[in-house]
Amino acid sequence: MIQQESRLKVADNTGAKEILCIRVLGGSSRRYASIGDVIVGTVKDAIPGGNVKRGDVVKAVVVRTAKECRRPDGSYIKFDENAAVIIKPDNDPRGTRIFGPVGRELREKRFMKIISLAPEVL
């Protein structure tokens, strides 16, 4: 459950380490984002020489949340941390590698490139 001012770990190799959620996309009164939802964020921590710099405003898709997410079969999935992958305007990832597992919900939301790059889909 990601909302404004939530901080997320970045799970790709763009050079960003942490982003702060500015807005949850998908309606004017939308408050929370879950796995597979797109957010707008600002880079709070980055490594030198990376593709993105501290202060850059980026779009990202949430790939892991600490709050459990209910699935249609009645099961729940939750992770140890909140994490996101920075994306381009065409919803392809900006980096070339994804670190850590991602939720299966990304497949339903058509983020196939992220699914194929991820080491594990839970």
UniProtKB/Swiss-Prot annotation:
Gene3D superfamilies: Ribosomal protein L14 (2.40.150.20). Signal peptide: none annotated. Keywords: Ribonucleoprotein, Ribosomal protein, RNA-binding, rRNA-binding. It comes from the Bacteria. GO terms for biological process: translation. GO terms for cellular component: cytosolic large ribosomal subunit. The keyword DNA-binding does not apply. One of its GO terms (molecular function) is structural constituent of ribosome. CDD domains: Ribosomal_uL14. Belongs to the universal ribosomal protein uL14 family. Part of the 50S ribosomal subunit. Forms a cluster with proteins L3 and L19. In the 70S ribosome, L14 and L19 interact and together make contacts with the 16S rRNA in bridges B5 and B8. HAMAP family: Ribosomal_uL14. PANTHER family: 50S/60S RIBOSOMAL PROTEIN L14/L23 (PTHR11761), LARGE RIBOSOMAL SUBUNIT PROTEIN UL14M (PTHR11761:SF3). Binds to 23S rRNA. Forms part of two intersubunit bridges in the 70S ribosome. This is Large ribosomal subunit protein uL14. It comes from Mycobacterium leprae (strain TN).
